[in-house]
Amino acid sequence: MVSLIEKNQLDSFIEKNPSWIIDNKTIKKEFKFENFIEAFGFMSKVALLSEKIDHHPDWQNIYNKVKINLTTHDKGGITTNDIKLAEAIDKLINS
């Protein structure tokens, strides 16, 4: 069973991944690509990752930008699932 992440765990994640921002009960990040096709391709890869992890982002796409917000709605905040997905997204973008 997944539970809310402890503050020290969240602080550690942000320290290692400063491009993710804490916003209330969410972690968020904006990605910028050369064009819409690259942005949409990235979203497709994240969608497949999300299915594999069984945790899905709230996101927005405007042309070459993708904004991702991660939270666990049924827990009312940030959980290990959000951190796991954020790390997987960063690994994907850096590969």
Swiss-Prot record:
- EC assignment: 4.2.1.96
Q: Which UniProt keywords apply?
A: Lyase
Please give the start and end residues of each transmembrane region: none
Superkingdom of origin: Bacteria
Instruction: Tell me if Lyase is a UniProt keyword of this record.
Output: yes
Reactions accelerated catalytically: (4aS,6R)-4a-hydroxy-L-erythro-5,6,7,8-tetrahydrobiopterin = (6R)-L-erythro-6,7-dihydrobiopterin + H2O
A GO molecular function term, named singly, is: 4-alpha-hydroxytetrahydrobiopterin dehydratase activity
The cross-references to Pfam families, in alphabetical order and at most eight, read:
Pterin_4a (PF01329)
GO biological process terms on file? tetrahydrobiopterin biosynthetic process
* Keyword presence, Transmembrane: no
Query: Can you tell me which family this protein belongs to?
Result: Belongs to the pterin-4-alpha-carbinolamine dehydratase family.
Name it: Putative pterin-4-alpha-carbinolamine dehydratase
Natural source organism: Prochlorococcus marinus (strain NATL2A)
